[in-house]
Swiss-Prot record:
GO terms for biological process: neuropeptide signaling pathway. This is Leucokinins. Stimulates both fluid secretion by the Malpighian tubules and hindgut contractions. Depolarize the transepithelial voltage of the Malpighian tubules in concentrations of less than 10(-9) M and increase the frequency of hindgut contractions at concentrations above 10(-8) M. Residues 19-164, 197-209, 221-228 form a propeptide. The modification Glycine amide is found at G180, G193, G217. It comes from Aedes aegypti (Yellowfever mosquito). Keywords: Amidation, Cleavage on pair of basic residues, Neuropeptide, Secreted, Signal.
Amino acid sequence: MAMLLQVALPLLAAVSWGWELNENDDSLAKIIEGCEWTSRQNVISEILLDRYRKYAMYNFFLLDDVCAVHEWNKNLKEPEFSENNEAEDKSPTSAQNTQEHIPGNNFPPPAASNPPVNSSCAKSAKDFFICLSNQLGDPTLNAMLLDNLEVACDPRFSPVSAIQKRNSKYVSKQKFYSWGGKRNNPNVFYPWGGKRNTGRVHRQPKVVIRNPFHAWGGKRNQKDDNVF
């Protein structure tokens, strides 16, 4: 199965490259003809390799449980250390399992580092990802897969999270507008997003100072007939 994959996939990539080369004959032909023979081989290899990576990534994302690979990779980056794990690490059996496999050593290699059998490569997305990593060893392909997994499976990149960020239930009312002006009613909303129905209890009553002049300029007369 592995030999069939290694032979069939490059052939498919070469056939697709040939079809696209006929369609885009002018652009690719100018690039290839302007190079020397060794450089020409490198250009063709880069084009085939890029299309093979896209083909492998397309088939990988056809699987149903691709987000399980994202969770598995995230747990590998952020291991959880607990008292039970520390106790297991101190035990002689765990020390024996974590020992590196050296030729001539009596201890078998760890089971987690063993690549899955070819028959199990298509059982799950995790096994398929491990098969691609072990058989191809292409760090660029692995980075492409992990980056696209983060965009597809991480809730921070989902459109639902963008809608929630704009909801007043999740975001408190800002005191300033985006253009820099200050809002007139900064206390209309609670910090958790709810709207205030009444004013604050501790707010002092508004004191109105009477203007001694009318709007038209004349002086006001008080009840005791004192003229200002």
